[in-house]
Each structure stands twice: as structure tokens, then as C-alpha cells.
């Protein structure tokens, strides 16, 4: 399955030509009228361009492409790092409360992640941020205080079709591209 930058039928055909079995379209399907993300968050995404994303390791030590927000810019510049550790600890407790995951299990998972990804202690603790920061934006609608995962394709998406309409559009576009290629 190919992923990264796919949002239409042309991309699907290109990926299939390269040997993929299919494509993942995370940002494209996030931005549909059927998506459970709050409307104000979808509207926020629709205002963003292709240069409004950044690959950041500052949230949890692992590279993620996210929308540039005030919080992300603070983390990237270092001005948000002063409060990162206390915030991560608070978020770990919130995550425990939200999921019922015992702290010992969270610590065990964190230590395994630290070892396998060669993370620092700070990065390991900050990994507790990710679920709560994603929830803040994508569930609670707090675009200013959360982290919003996004592909660069966010800058070329300008509508919120239903998932059914989007799938039909992608199929129609892919068929059109294939027809034009076989006609040559």
C-alpha cells in the first residue's frame, strides 16, 4: 500500500503503475463530510497550503508530518520545551484516566519504545503527549492547543465530499486516466 501525497485518481493510477496494491489517503478521507472530526477543524485544514505542514520530532521524538500551528512552532523553536516534560506527565495521567491503562503498563510500553527507537528519556516521557494532543484538536476541536496530523496534500484539497462521492470520484478519475493512456 502506497502512502503519502495521494488524494485523487491520478495518484492511484501512478501508485498502481509503480506496483502498489492500493493507496492510503489519510488526509483526503479526514477531509470529508462523513469524517467525525469537528467541522471547525475541517474548516481550519481547508485554509492550509502545501507549505503549512512540517515534519516534527518535537511532539514525541518520532517524525510526524503535522500542520504548522502556534504550539508546533513553539515546540520546533524550543520555546515550548520548558513546559514539555510537566505537560507530558500531565497528559500521561489524562491518558491513563481516559483509557484505564495502568501506569505500569504505560511505563513498560514507554521503555520498550525508548529502547527500540533509541529515544532520550525526555522523548520517551513526551510520547505521552501524542494521544492527548491529537484528541485536543481532532476530537475536542481545539486547533490552537493540539497537534493535527496532515499530509502536504492538505494544500490541494478544497472540498468536503461524502466518502461515497469521493470514492466514486477517485474511481472515475482513475478510469479516465487509464482510458487516456490506453488510447495513445
Which residue stretches match the model-derived regions?
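Short beta-strand/loop segments at the ligand-binding rim of alpha/beta enzyme cores
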Residues: 1-3
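Conserved active-site-proximal phosphate/metal-binding subdomains
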Residues: 7-184
Amino acid at each position: 500500500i502506497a502512502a503519502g501525497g495521494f488524494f485523487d485518481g491520478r495518484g492511484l493510477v501512478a501508485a498502481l503503475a509503480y506496483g502498489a496494491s492500493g493507496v492510503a489517503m489519510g488526509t483526503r478521507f479526514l477531509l470529508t463530510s462523513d469524517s467525525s472530526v469537528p467541522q471547525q477543524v475541517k474548516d481550519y485544514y481547508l485554509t492550509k497550503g502545501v507549505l503549512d505542514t512540517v515534519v516534527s520530532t518535537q511532539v514525541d521524538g518520532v517524525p510526524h508530518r503535522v500542520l504548522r500551528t502556534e504550539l508546533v512552532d513553539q515546540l520546533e523553536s524550543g520555546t515550548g520545551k520548558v513546559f514539555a516534560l510537566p505537560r507530558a506527565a500531565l497528559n500521561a495521567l489524562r491518558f491513563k484516566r481516559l483509557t484505564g491503562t495502568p501506569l505500569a503498563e504505560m511505563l513498560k510500553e514507554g521503555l520498550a519504545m525508548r529502547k527500540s527507537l533509541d529515544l532520550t528519556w525526555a522523548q520517551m516521557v513526551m510520547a505521552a503527549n501524542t494521544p492527548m494532543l491529537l484528541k485536543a484538536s481532532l476530537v475536542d476541536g481545539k486547533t490552537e492547543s493540539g497537534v493535527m496530523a496532515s499530509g502536504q496534500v492538505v494544500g490541494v484539497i478544497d472540498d468536503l465530499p461524502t466518502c461515497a462521492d469521493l470514492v466514486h470520484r477517485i474511481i472515475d478519475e482513475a478510469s479516465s486516466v487509464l482510458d487516456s493512456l490506453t488510447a495513445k
